[in-house]
């Protein structure tokens, strides 16, 4: 096993330890980044950006779609939860049938983007609420072939800059998830155009990745599925803590993304914006989610220099503080609400890639795929709890105080990540 000294030490000054022998790392910061790596990252990230426009395409048009299909409040909330559930099922099935060994990553991403686009567009002809929800579930299953394989492809091109690379990738898909909210500010109640536009972008992403993307030189061969692999992975302290931090992060993230537009709309209405509150709420949701792209990029850049766990602690603590402050700014001047949700959006996802990067470093190289799949699956399963619970809390206490439900997640994640700050871990080499 090759070990890398403290996670907080600059990569250029790290030393590799093999047994009791310390060998200076003579490679420069860029020396282990192969030619073409950054170009490949651009292709993969752009494909992710385009494909992930499907995720919130129905959520962004929930009011208009609910009226069209005469949905109840419970059915409307399932438009988003169905995607989460489909994604969980898809990632678990991918692990059990060993898709990563049977199909190239670029082909998986293409198949997921294309099939997801078809399922999403089919909502236009759904005869009722539950058929539409079923199609959104299938969209989530398809996206399970878009997100984790792309993450593994991107990681296969980088070693010392893996934190930045995955940060840029997560930033791209974050921006993609924000795009439907921007579409609603343009298309208004014409929800059909939002769904069709998202499906068209996803088709383009699938075509892009299958034609131009390829795996990098640091892709370790995967094992056949081992039912005991997860148990062995959880014996590794670094893997356990990285997953624990990720779960705290996911407790907050998707509930915030799903309902921040509703929170902002309610706040603007309380401030007296009247009919323009809904459009302003969609704009706030786009800016809140979209600002996360910059957060991911900055966090990735800093993480490779100051440590992934340390950056995660900062992001988790800040996002928890923002969740608390939502109660204070509710109903105040819109500029304060916009400022807070943008800061919240910037930090709530900034650490996302670092949990994945930590897992790729602590897990054995030939079990990285299983580790990422397990981490992603249980994380997205947890999101369904808070996505469902948040509007219920709002129904009892109002949107002013609903986001306080999300605070325990990042607090718990902060404690898990503090245990990893400055600790040596396995190298991704």
Put a short name on every predicted segment.
Residues 58-59, 239-289, 293:
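Extracytoplasmic gate region of multi-pass secondary transporters
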